[in-house]
Swiss-Prot record:
Signal sequence coordinates: 1-26
Subcellular location, record wording: Secreted
Residues bearing carbohydrate: 129, 174, 202, 395, 410, 538, 645, 721, 756
Catalytic residues identified in the record: 143 (charge relay system), 218 (charge relay system), 553 (charge relay system)
Domain Peptidase S8: 113-622
Family in the record: Belongs to the peptidase S8 family.
GO-annotated biological processes: proteolysis
Name recorded for this polypeptide: Subtilisin-like protease SBT3.8
Phylogenetic placement of the source organism: Eukaryota, Viridiplantae, Streptophyta, Embryophyta, Tracheophyta
Molecular function per GO: serine-type endopeptidase activity
Biological source species: Arabidopsis thaliana
Top-level taxon: Eukaryota
GO cellular component term of the entry, any: extracellular region
This protein's record includes keyword Glycoprotein: yes
Amino acid sequence: MKSCRTLIFVAIILNGLSTFVAHAGAESKVHIVYLGEKQHDDPEFVTESHHRMLWSLLGSKEDAHSSMVHSYRHGFSGFAAKLTKSQAKKLADLPEVVHVTPDSFYQLDTTRTWDYLGLSVANPKNLLNDTNMGEEVIIGIVDSGVWPESEVFNDNGIGPVPSHWKGGCVSGENFTSSQCNKKLIGAKYFINGFLATHESFNSTESLDFISPRDRSGHGTHVATIAGGSYVPSISYKGLAGGTVRGGAPRARIAMYKACWYLDRFDINTCSSADILKAMDEAMHDGVDVLSLSIGYRFPYFPETDVRAVIATGAFHAVLKGITVVCSGGNSGPAAQTVGNTAPWILTVAATTLDRSFPTPITLGNNKLILGQAMYTGPELGFTSLVYPENPGNSNESFSGDCELLFFNSNHTMAGKVVLCFTTSTRYITVSSAVSYVKEAGGLGVIVARNPGDNLSPCEDDFPCVAVDYELGTDILLYIRSTGLPVVKIQPSKTLVGQPVGTKVADFSSRGPNSIEPAILKPDIAAPGVSILAATTTNKTFNDRGFIFLSGTSMAAPTISGVVALLKALHRDWSPAAIRSAIVTTAWRTDPFGEQIFAEGSPRKLADPFDYGGGLVNPEKAAKPGLVYDLGLEDYVLYMCSVGYNETSISQLVGKGTVCSNPKPSVLDFNLPSITIPNLKDEVTLTRTLTNVGQLESVYKVVIEPPIGIQVTVTPETLLFNSTTKRVSFKVKVSTTHKINTGYFFGSLTWSDSLHNVTIPLSVRTQILQNYYDEN
């Protein structure tokens, strides 16, 4: 059995619905057989070698072909096949096989965004116009498909398809290849892994389409944010009005549908075998950026684990110069929940915009309170207001908890606006409360809760308004102060700019990285709350095919759009250089210079575990001055440092590898961040900077040390010229703390007259190692 640190291919727990029967009657399930770097350039030869391996195992060519689910033959070598446990073990024991693992399932994790980030078309000299809006760049998206009729995929004024494109569009149910154009240049679907497990999936009864066509709207929304064309005069029933467009509005979109809608569960699910096939095809087709708003439920798997499928596919993509952008997950605000943590992936957190939807609530004492809602119905004039509680002389059951409103009798809530309190920030709490009140004949709901970022319209445009506990208590005190409390609720308004502050979203998954704590995740943050973009026309709450959605799923394509522009401007930059440019130039405040907070309980100032380097600053990222670059040798150093065995590394990279003894330190991995999770004794680490700015330049170091941490940099000045383009420096770090601490944060900046190249410092002192303190 190979080491648990062996480099492997990804999959996840199979749900056991597959009933394929092998020779001995044992249950067969889809397994992914990972063979590492492909040994031949001819994809047909690679696939034939996969069939031969299966033929040798199963005994006949027919069985080999019927067992095969996918052949991975472009970016790497491997295949997915239906195998019994014993068959999988026989393959795993072959020397040419890196690993075999069962298939598994992943889940799916803008009118204002781009102006907010400074990418306005009104400025003739900016990144957007300097790159012709990304016209020669191809953004590949692995998601739930595409709704090709949406206006955001119009190709008005767009030139010929880029010459490096090798892909195409595949016809299927309710989708023909003719629906592609010079904007939507690719559309494929991958369902074999899904069908092998969900054999009961009935295409005639399912709401999904066995084609690239989107059912859920998620993929269409993501594609809009990354590279949608201009569509003017869009709003949601009058809210958030403006022009919808993507970050790179002339970039080309290639959709790879690998996520499928399960009607009985009302969810999208994505087979790891299908995800890998989609990534493999995208590498072959010639995409420049790969965007995946897909994640796996916690706990996560290291990139050395077979189940970390996206990490494995992403590694091969990055080696081919393709930047891979992934959502960080929606499991916040708890710490150590960030996903997609492989160090070659650009992992994205979600923030709010400088936009809100204040909703006037007027009490009977004329006090005005501004709640938050997406209420676009008519004004609800002064109406009875109630908080269900026992007045002291009743045997009835009362509850003012939003989750328990069903305990109240109908006459308690009928014809009234109901105030309730909840500790939850999840939208399901609001929707449940609305359902209870509507069934009882109520006319509206005011929900008092912790601050959250899950604002959505309520069904049938029912008045449902969120307030915090302080304002909720003000309303409750008013109710208790009078015998006939009343309230008026007016439609929501759109407020843009100051005084609306930027926050890291409550749901956005947080660091530190639970897999490899020395690798900072997330890398960067971008708007992902209440983003208005295209969807399918059958979606609830859509207005003319546009909808508000929130999630790191929306933040990731924002970064993908920025990456597309940077790729158009700097064709020779590696994925690591692009990541560095984005991270080192990010705002640590909002665009107006105000501090960024992180939603949670309690709300706090954001730190690198909330937003990585900060909020993306596209204009600055275009001219970073210096970058922390990475190449194959750096990735090999990283793999050696975290314990990959040499055989696995060799198979992965396609050439012999020998790790040094002693093994290198992961702290020397040339990331645009420094994270030390277990500082006890003094450590010295190395970073290397590459000049991508002015040929003759001088940079001086500026250090903001974490509290109680001593940081020394040598040398303090870096000189670049025509012969010196790469310079290394050493960072010596020690602690003055005498106890185990939490993380403290600082920064290290290299500055000249034009650039500030900043990386976050995150340091935790651990005098007693591997110790968990619950005091």
